[in-house]
Amino acid sequence: MRNSSSSTPPSIKAQHRAAKRRAIRRRRIDLNCGCSIYIHIDCRNNGFTHRGTYHCASSREWRLYLGDNKSPLFQDNQRRGSPLHQHQDIPLTNQVQPQPEESIGSPQGISQLPSMDDIDDSFWENLFK
């Protein structure tokens, strides 16, 4: 039942519908491994790690889409400022920390638990009394 009072605020359903239809602004980055990453436009100049390699999502590399079929035209804007690292004579080490390989066995913190079938019935009877 609708409220006939003039003090009720207008419905925001129309605004919600428009917000749902609005496209998410994101940028596509094609990596050397063949993967494509989509980064939200507000997350520019942030980095990310993919398959053990750190990538910087700066505005140096960007993709421009043309027309309705979105054909890619790759651009690489060359930086015209000072170099990123001022001291070129100091060797820079790789800051990427390798990820440990996953093991098939049980985790280190949990020892192997006995099978529930190996526990005798008297234990369960005493437990639930």
From Swiss-Prot:
It comes from Tomato golden mosaic virus (strain Yellow vein). Residues 91-114 have a biased composition (Polar residues). This is Transcriptional activator protein. Phosphorylated. The zinc finger and the transactivation region are involved in PTGS suppression. The keyword tRNA processing does not apply. Keywords: Activator, DNA-binding, Host cytoplasm, Host nucleus, Host-virus interaction, Inhibition of host innate immune response by virus, Metal-binding, Phosphoprotein, Suppressor of RNA silencing, Viral immunoevasion, Zinc, Zinc-finger. Belongs to the geminiviridae transcriptional activator protein family.
